[in-house]
Amino acid sequence: MKEEVKKYYGEILKKSVDLQTNACCTRDSYPKYIKDCIKNIHTEVVESYYGCGLVIPDCLEDCNVLDLGCGTGMDVYILSQLVGKNGKVTGIDMTHEQIGKAIKFQKYHNEKFGFENTTFIEGYI
């Protein structure tokens, strides 16, 4: 089963529109401050988002956050903006292709946000 999931997310899915499920919610329901964060994220990361919603508590500034199954990193990059320069966000994903895309755009987001506070790890949760 693990290999099937890796193949689906690593080889079959290329963009958000390729996702074959209705279990995930749309970004239309996100609050404005999250939508504003998404505007700062590279288009290629946003277009390859396969998440099932984002639950974010209040008061994240300066916190350390772990994103399990981070995929291409959109939630990590949203959280990066919310925790700020003194916080840290770590994303873990088992899919080489997904985590590779997250890392590919890490420098872009570091420069865009003005700080480096993200780490990506390829591994199992």
What would you call each of these model-derived segments?
Residues 21-22, 56, 67:
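Mature extracytoplasmic/luminal segments of secretory-pathway proteins
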Residues 24-25, 52, 70:
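Disulfide-bonded cysteines in secreted/extracellular proteins and peptides
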Residues 7, 11, 36, 40, ...:
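Charged/polar, solvent-exposed surface patches and flexible loops
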